[in-house]
Amino acid sequence: VADSLGYSYNLISDNLSIYSRYPIIRKYAFADSISTFNFGGVMIDVDGKPVRVFNTWLHYLPDMRLAPTDKSKEEILAWEMEGTRDEEIHKILSVLQPLLAEADSIPIIMGGDFNVHSHLDWTEATRNLYLHGGAVVDWPVSIAMEEAGFKDSFREMNPNPVANLGVTWLTDADSLETECRMDRIDFIYYQGKTIQAIASECYDNSLGKTFTFKGEDFFYPSDHGFVLSKFELK
């Protein structure tokens, strides 16, 4: 695919890869601290400006579709902490610390399948919408990203989750026996003084179905939707 488009390509692992229309000038892996199955990245040259781009995958369990929204906030968070996502994101943020210190001169974009909701979506305003079951939840992974200085590009550009929740998962709910939430678990975060999101949209589709994009029909190859964010470098 990369060769046919004339793109640069980095295979981080059999789970993660990065395609870039801009030259890749450096690759990053932190295998001693976090598996390349979960995280890795590159530095690209955007018309003479370096940008660090990272791809992320956090574990899919516990399954967000089964979040016990009828329980208390404390019980929901205890359920979430039974998995490894919180541990994984803190390992990732730990290895990124030297690069985060340079983010104002070399901006960072960090995207991927985080397999967990965002506290920016599970608010007082949405508690009785989207099958949230009355729950308002400070999901730990998105809180950790925010505390590390990252901005959620989609929610920054679409600040009202009531008007635009942004769905990247579970378009296939009709195939399930019980009603399931369709929610946002894929994100593009960014950080740095010289980068600014100027547009962001979530596109929702299902594996194997036809997807129409920019007037063309495509076979859709993923069980997730995707986020498309546009950035301006200053």
Feature map (PLM): residue ranges:
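Stable alpha-helical elements in mature extracytoplasmic
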Residues: 1, 15, 85-95, 137-141
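A solvent-exposed, charged loop/short amphipathic helix patch at secondary-structure junctions
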Residues: 63-83, 125
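Metal-dependent phosphoester-hydrolase catalytic domains
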Residues: 98-108, 116-234
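His/acidic metal-ligating clusters that form di-metal
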Residues: 45, 52, 81-114
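Structured beta-strand-rich core segments of catalytic domains in phosphoester-bond hydrolases
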Residues: 1-67, 202
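A structural motif
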Residues: 46-72, 111-120, 150, 154
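Sec-exported extracytoplasmic/periplasmic mature domains
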Residues: 2-6, 21-24, 97-101, 146-150
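A short acidic, glycine-rich active-site loop
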Residues: 76-86, 130-136
